[in-house]
């Protein structure tokens, strides 16, 4: 097989990343510059600040990715870049940089959907992984159950109707005084608590759907804390964290395994920042073993936003001749499968 080298760029939120990926599976470099410490004091990502920080660092990050991979731009076959979904200003920084690079070097430009990128992280982690399989995409801004029919063929089976999982985690963490980002902090605190101490609601839709809703459980936690505060009752934060986390993961677990049953598929690949959550990993692995369903997780560095996953997705798009024109624009609400 001929080696195809993809230079990939990711800037959809608060990570500026560039990577060099071979044939969608082998990572030669994956440079990530995170803005977490900057946004922490604001309690969340400030879009304008994120955009400015991307502008300041992107040139260095791309050059460092080429240097770490020990290749030059001449060695690159195509340039992949995230063009949605995400923050419009942040997306534009990466996209415009990639356009300029592709134009100047006469390399093909490959626009990549950020969600496809998250799913493709599993192709890096598992070198022999091939569709079909089910993917559960869980992150700060996205929650999807996706039927991966082929490398570039996706069917959204379920999605959140309100808050994404990571969004709910951040809001609950803030109410518990844990700060931002909330996911890792709740995961850590929950280990000290009783997941059955408090009964928080699990949203179930009556119609034939595998969609999610996490605004109810988030509101239930906030109401519980407010009532306890008004009555002067001391709250066990670890129990709240553990009970909230169990409520969320129960719903994710039920819907994704029901999808496997409906689609007659015995493989689930988890993706997105929340895929690093230890309780989610343990719960799905345990349930998967009982149901004889294989559960796949990328390593944590591939769960967070990174350019290696974009490079993998770009390679498979390139193989299908999904090459972008230079009038491609950033799409903050880009749907999976939209071209």
From Swiss-Prot:
Q: Which InterPro entries match?
A: ATPase_NBD (IPR043129), Gcp-like_dom (IPR000905), KAE1/TsaD (IPR017861), TsaD (IPR022450)
The protein's location, in the record's own words, is: Cytoplasm
Which EC main class describes this enzyme? Answer: transferase
Q: Which free-text remark accompanies the cofactor?
A: Binds 1 Fe(2+) ion per subunit.
Q: Which domain of life is it from?
A: Bacteria
Q: Name the cofactor(s).
A: Fe(2+)
Tell me the Pfam families matching this sequence.
Answer: TsaD (PF00814)
Recorded GO MF terms: iron ion binding; N(6)-L-threonylcarbamoyladenine synthase activity
Q: What is its EC number?
A: 2.3.1.234
Positions bound to Fe cation: 114, 118, 305
What are the recorded Gene Ontology BP terms? Answer: tRNA threonylcarbamoyladenosine modification
Q: Which UniProt keywords apply?
A: Acyltransferase, Cytoplasm, Iron, Metal-binding, Transferase, tRNA processing
Write out the catalysed reaction: L-threonylcarbamoyladenylate + adenosine(37) in tRNA = N(6)-L-threonylcarbamoyladenosine(37) in tRNA + AMP + H(+)
Gene Ontology CC: cytoplasm
Q: Where does this protein chiefly localize? A: cytoplasm
Similarity comment text for this entry: Belongs to the KAE1 / TsaD family.
Functional summary from the UniProt entry: Required for the formation of a threonylcarbamoyl group on adenosine at position 37 (t(6)A37) in tRNAs that read codons beginning with adenine. Is involved in the transfer of the threonylcarbamoyl moiety of threonylcarbamoyl-AMP (TC-AMP) to the N6 group of A37, together with TsaE and TsaB. TsaD likely plays a direct catalytic role in this reaction.
User: What's the protein called, per UniProt?
Assistant: tRNA N6-adenosine threonylcarbamoyltransferase
Give the organism's phylogenetic lineage.
Bacteria, Bacillati, Bacillota, Clostridia, Eubacteriales
Q: Which gene encodes it?
A: tsaD
């Amino acid at each position: 097989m001929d080696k195809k080298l993809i230079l990939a760029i990711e800037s959809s939120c608060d990570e500026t990343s560039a990577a060099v990926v071979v044939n969608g599976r082998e990572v030669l470099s994956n440079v990530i510059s995170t803005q977490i410490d900057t946004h922490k004091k604001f309690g969340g990502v400030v879009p304008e600040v994120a955009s400015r920080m991307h502008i300041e660092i992107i040139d260095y990050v791309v050059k460092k990715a080429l240097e770490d991979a020990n290749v030059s731009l001449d060695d690159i076959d195509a340039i992949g870049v995230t063009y949605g979904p995400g923050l419009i200003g942040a997306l534009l920084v990466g996209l415009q940089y990639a356009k300029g690079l592709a134009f100047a070097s006469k390399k093909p430009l490959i626009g990549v959907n950020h969600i496809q990128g998250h799913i493709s992280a599993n192709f890096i982690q598992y070198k022999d992984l091939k569709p079909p399989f089910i993917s559960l995409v869980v992150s700060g801004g996205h929650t999807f159950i996706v039927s991966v029919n082929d490398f570039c063929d996706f069917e959204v089976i379920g999605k959140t109707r309100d808050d994404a999982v990571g969004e709910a985690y951040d809001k609950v963490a803030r109410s518990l005084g844990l700060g931002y980002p909330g996911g890792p902090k709740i995961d850590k605190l929950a280990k000290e608590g009783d997941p059955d101490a408090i009964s928080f609601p699990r949203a179930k839709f009556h119609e034939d759907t595998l969609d999610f809703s996490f605004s109810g459980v988030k509101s239930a936690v906030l109401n519980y804390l407010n009532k306890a505060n008004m009555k002067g009752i001391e709250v066990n934060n670890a129990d709240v964290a553990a009970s909230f986390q169990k409520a969320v993961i129960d719903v994710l677990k039920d819907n994704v395994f029901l999808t496997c049953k409906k689609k007659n598929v015995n493989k689930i690949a988890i993706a997105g920042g929340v895929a690093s959550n230890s309780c989610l990993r343990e719960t799905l692995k345990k349930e998967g073993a009982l149901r004889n369903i294989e559960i796949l997780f990328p390593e944590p560095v591939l769960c967070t936003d990174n350019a290696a996953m974009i490079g993998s997705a770009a390679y498979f798009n390139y193989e299908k001749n999904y090459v972008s024109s230079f009038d491609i624009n950033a799409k903050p609400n880009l749907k999976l499968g939209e071209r």
